[in-house]
């Protein structure tokens, strides 16, 4: 993994301090999980470089993200859903895949051309998904058109991707970049790598004839709403300028269990982003040289991105429509009185816990 410079992140400060807090918070989790069952699986449709396609999304239950076990990102609670012990056997992972195929067969008329596999960590990290399992999964889905696999930049390797590309699959690597601003990624998200590492991962993916889908995080902790929106606008454009990065998924933060963000939320120190902030970014970056989409998980709830409660579903539907059509005019069809409050926040807010609207 990339190493943080010791003059910035000495013991007891910076990432070291974040990791210490995160380990204590994560240690409160005493739930256990079945290693033969996937964390989640669902059918949907996604916009891809080949157009809108039916998709099967799989979240494999692995031993979880290596970085999360060291402490990890301030907002990410996915490791709490992972099997305890750090590893899941090949046979159990393939049983999970069988369950996902059964789920698809029961609910879809035809196999989905797009397969998206996440592990709440790194699919390409062989501690999570052994090479044997990676090859078996590539074989299981070799008749589909496109695969998306999740990974931190460190593990993006042309040899690993060849398991899929050699079978004729179009491949995209989903990288949780979170922001193009290194300081925000290090100090607010507590993610260890630099933007230069993302660029290197894009180059490695290109060498394997694969593409990259960047995942950005709107409003990590310690950023005000206007600062978070501006960071996303800059980050989308910077990602779109990297050769090989053809899609940017800009997703608002939600409050997950066993995270620093949850601690801040309960103490009045964090408010998830306004839903209005998402169209603001999507409209401003519609001319970027990449497909830009957003998926507001938990929209309309106090722990997820939300407006006033009256217009949340309408704004969410407009965002989903934009994802498929890439037409910003859909946002002009949605209005609500609470947009005036959001405008006020965007003009005047300077603190990250939104005291102006409390």
Labelled PLM ranges:
Residues 87-103, 129-137, 196, 228-236, ...:
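Well-ordered, non-membrane alpha-helical segments in soluble/globular domains
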Residues 183-191, 218-226, 264-269:
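Surface-exposed cleft-lining segments at the edges of enzyme active sites
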Residues 33-38, 42-95:
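Canonical Radical SAM [4Fe-4S] cluster-binding loop centered on the CxxxCxxC motif
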Residues 79-100, 104-128, 140-156, 170-198, ...:
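Core AdoMet radical
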Residues 102-109, 135-142, 160-170, 203-209, ...:
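Acidic (Asp/Glu)-rich catalytic clusters
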Residues 196-259, 278-296:
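Conserved C-terminal portion of the radical SAM core fold
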Residues 2-31, 37, 240, 253-358:
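Auxiliary Fe-S-binding modules of radical SAM enzymes
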